[in-house]
Amino acid sequence: MKLNEVKEFVKELRGLSQEELAKRENELKKELFDLRFQAAAGQLEQTARLKEVKKQIARIKTVQSEVK
């Protein structure tokens, strides 16, 4: 993700409720699990997606802690 995309993503996250943030986090965790499984099986072609999903999860957790 480029800087502008990251800023838009975080801006979008800040507009969501705690429940929506938790739902989005769970979806990304499921995707991360699937990506790790594909990587272990040697089927993952977009290895950078692992890093991107981890960062998105961290951003969601940061926004959640800002609200608390």
From Swiss-Prot:
UniProt keywords, alphabetically: Ribonucleoprotein, Ribosomal protein
MF GO annotations: structural constituent of ribosome
Cited PROSITE patterns: RIBOSOMAL_L29
InterPro entries the UniProt entry points to: Ribosomal_protein_uL29, Ribosomal_uL29, Ribosomal_uL29_CS, Ribosomal_uL29_sf
GO biological process, one term: translation
Database matches in Pfam families: Ribosomal_L29
Transmembrane segments: none
Record-level GO cellular component terms: cytosolic large ribosomal subunit
Family indicated by similarity: Belongs to the universal ribosomal protein uL29 family.
NCBIfam families: L29
Protein name: Large ribosomal subunit protein uL29
Native organism: Streptococcus sanguinis (strain SK36)
